[in-house]
Amino acid sequence: RKLGISSVFRVNGPAGIAALGFGTESIERVAKIVGPGSPAVALAQVEMQRFGVSTMMLLGPTESLVIADETADPVRLAADLLIEAEHGNDSSVVLLTTSISLADATDAQLAEQLDALPEVRATAARASLGPNGGCVIVDDLAMAIDVANAYAAEHLQVAVADDQVDFVVDGLINAGEILVGQHTPFSAANFVIGCPASLPTSGFAQVSSGITAD
């Protein structure tokens, strides 16, 4: 109500996109369709552009990056990585750190916490952390900033010492969202604090931003 939304329709998949784009007996044709979805939904949105419907950029698989130094808690770090890694087999999760000891401790925690996940989630998480993601060791936080800007992640968390937070955040240019501190996990952005669900993926954070409403 606060956004002025007067109609809500329970439709899903490409059929739902078509219903909104062409209109039906019960759904009025719309001018714009935005929001995340499966590859089939994304393709349906692209197809609707041929019929004069405005849509957003294509959204690929979710991708998350964490910049962490030796002060980060590996237990919570592993949990935050798994929050995103369990999305699906095509997701990508990357730990970017200046600390080899933190990388080792986080790896051990990931192995332990993966065993506690349901098998279907664990399988997806292993793909996101392994073939699609991993850990990158950098010399210092300045290099971490450069790597993060080049990667242009959809979700980015900064888990560094308090006196380094401003330095890192001020240097970050390309990211769908930036979460500061381990008290701001990816789950908070996904479900609690109001960040948009439609965020740029596949490097598009270099040229675009998330969907918001005024």
Where are these regions (language model features)?
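Short, solvent-exposed amphipathic alpha-helical segments in soluble enzyme
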Residues: 1-2, 25, 48-51, 80-85, ...
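Conserved NAD(P)+-binding/catalytic subdomain of aldehyde/semialdehyde dehydrogenases
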Residues: 3-92
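Short, well-ordered alpha-helix to beta-strand connector turns
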Residues: 5, 30, 62, 132, ...
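Structural motif
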Residues: 33-34, 65-67, 94-96, 137, ...
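Short, glycine-/Ser/Thr-/acidic-enriched flexible segments
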Residues: 39-40, 70-73, 100-101, 141-143, ...
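A conserved active-site cap/scaffold subdomain adjacent to cofactor or substrate pockets
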Residues: 57-131, 135
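Active-site rim loops that border cofactor/substrate pockets in soluble metabolic enzymes
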Residues: 121-159
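C-terminal core of ALDH-fold dehydrogenases
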Residues: 150-214
